[in-house]
Amino acid sequence: ANNPGARKAIRKIEARTEVN
């Protein structure tokens, strides 16, 4: 998904995984 919104969501999920 090259959509900016989807990328933002993926980045947010990645950040959450990093905190995990």
Curated annotation (Swiss-Prot):
Annotated signal sequence range: none
Indicate whether rRNA-binding appears among the record's keywords. Answer: yes
Please give the residue ranges the record annotates as the region Disordered: 1-20
Q: Where is the composition biased (Basic and acidic residues)?
A: 11-20
Report the GO molecular function annotations: rRNA binding
Keywords of this entry: Ribonucleoprotein, Ribosomal protein, RNA-binding, rRNA-binding
Cellular component terms (Gene Ontology): ribonucleoprotein complex; ribosome
Q: Kindly list the cysteine pairs connected by disulfide bridges.
A: none
State the protein's name. Answer: Small ribosomal subunit protein bS20
Q: Which organism is it from?
A: Brevundimonas vesicularis
| The organism's place on the tree of life at top rank | Bacteria
